[in-house]
Amino acid sequence: MSLDTKYDKFYSSDTGQPAHTDVVLNGWPRNRTEAIVNLPLTGDSILDVGCGDGRLLYQFRHRFKRLIGLEYSAVRLEAAKVQMQHLPFEGICGSAEAMPQLASNSIDAIVSADVIEHIPDVYQAADEMLRVLRPGGVLVINTPNIAFVKKRLRLLVGRFPSTSQPNEGLGSDVMFDGGHLHYFTYRSLSLVLERSGFVIERRIGFGQLGRLHHTWPSLLSVGVQLLARKPGLAP
């Protein structure tokens, strides 16, 4: 079974979901979606790398004129098109490792929630995201934090600290650990982005206990979230 077929099978439940609704922010962000939506991102165009059914991109419909979603799974992209049919949504089926449909220096902001851990070549994906961003453009990216305190404790007792599926990643018969190929800390994800030329501006912690997760994000945040910028000034 090919990888794209596995993803389509894994996410087949996305079809027929209720219409998207607005995320209600109440205090410090408690999950990956709130952590991105909480930031004051505005502009002409926004790209969601790994847009899924469009739930995150939907939150930016009043802040950007163009809503562009890149999604590897054709099943998930079709779900996004249904959800976003009355919005200026542009769906692209493909991988972040190669986005020939997008011109260089054409995007104001990129968001990506729990996607980079699925991408085989993370260096190429980072290079492509830098390429399509306009000078001064912003990338907001998050991924599970393998150094979260609960993960450290699981490893301490000899259990694999899986970040998607239970039972040490064996919870699905389709893909090991939900298709996660890589595991990141704040430092390692920062190094990947900096290698491509991004400048890291903020490291943001989030979780169910609110701001507490931000006091020591490398240990207490359930996810790694970075705000990075492409050097240069917008034309």
Regions found by a protein language model. Name each.
Residues 2-30, 72, 79, 120-128, ...:
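S-adenosyl-L-methionine-dependent methyltransferase catalytic module, highlighting the catalytic core
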Residues 33-152, 186-190, 225-230:
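Conserved SAM-binding loop
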